[in-house]
Swiss-Prot record:
Top-level division of the source organism's lineage: Eukaryota
Keyword Ribonucleoprotein in annotation: yes
GO biological process, one term: translation
Gene Ontology MF terms in the entry: mRNA binding; RNA binding; structural constituent of ribosome
Protein name from the UniProt record: Large ribosomal subunit protein eL18z
GO CC terms, sorted: cytosolic large ribosomal subunit
Family label: Belongs to the eukaryotic ribosomal protein eL18 family.
Organism this protein belongs to: Arabidopsis thaliana
Pfam family, one: Ribosomal_L18
This protein's encoding gene: RPL18A
Keywords recorded for this protein, A-Z: Ribonucleoprotein, Ribosomal protein
Chain segments annotated as transmembrane: none
Length: 188
């Protein structure tokens, strides 16, 4: 007899074995990567494949300024991002970088090309170095900078909580009454 996992309070962990998206280009990438993982036994390829399965929230975009900061002192290496590379107007000069990503915004692509850099796709990267781990730097964007994440955490209003409340409008007196102002009872 088998064990009833769910009734026994145990649930088997699930993990994605394919992307949820119906994007045909993503499916082709997954197909190519599966082959590479199987034939090269490279951990780098396995990580890329796992990240290709991820949801959009977990494939956070990476700005050009962060990319430049992370690639400082890593000359001659290829930056690999399973996600989007976005432009950042706060950075003035972009060095010549070779970047591989799922997609680039138009302005980010233009700035990388203008600086003498290169924007590669994952299939273009697989041709020169199939195991990829040589001369590459695997990066990912910040996941918790989404607006939605600001609302997570201890309830707004409890002491020492910096959680953003869900309110219809913002203003001087909204969500800052009792416990937040001395004139309204007390201030924590």
């Amino acid at each position: 007899m088998g064990i009833d996992l769910i009734a026994g309070g145990k649930s088997k962990k699930t993990k994605r074995t394919e992307p949820k998206s119906d994007d045909v280009y993503l499916k082709l990438l997954v197909k190519a990567n599966r082959y590479l993982v199987r034939r090269t036994e490279s951990k780098f390829n396995a990580v890329i494949l796992k990240r290709l399965f991820m949801s959009k929230v977990n494939k956070a975009p990476l700005s050009l300024s962060r990319l430049v900061r992370y690639m400082d002192g890593k000359d001659g290496k290829i930056a690999v991002i399973v996600g989007t590379v976005t432009d950042d107007v706060r950075i003035e000069d972009v060095p010549a970088l070779t970047v591989t990503a799922l997609r680039f915004t138009e302005s980010a692509r233009a700035r990388i090309h203008k600086a003498g850099g290169e924007c590669l796709t994952f299939d273009q990267l697989a041709l020169p170095c199939p195991t990829w781990s040589e001369n590459t730097v695997l990066l990912r964007g910040p996941k918790n900078t989404r607006e939605a994440v600001k609302h997570f955490g201890p309830a707004p209003g409890v002491p020492h909580s910096h959680t953003k409340p869900y309110v219809r409008q913002t203003g001087k007196k909204i969500e800052i009454a009792r416990g937040r102002r001395r004139s309204r009872g007390f201030k924590v």
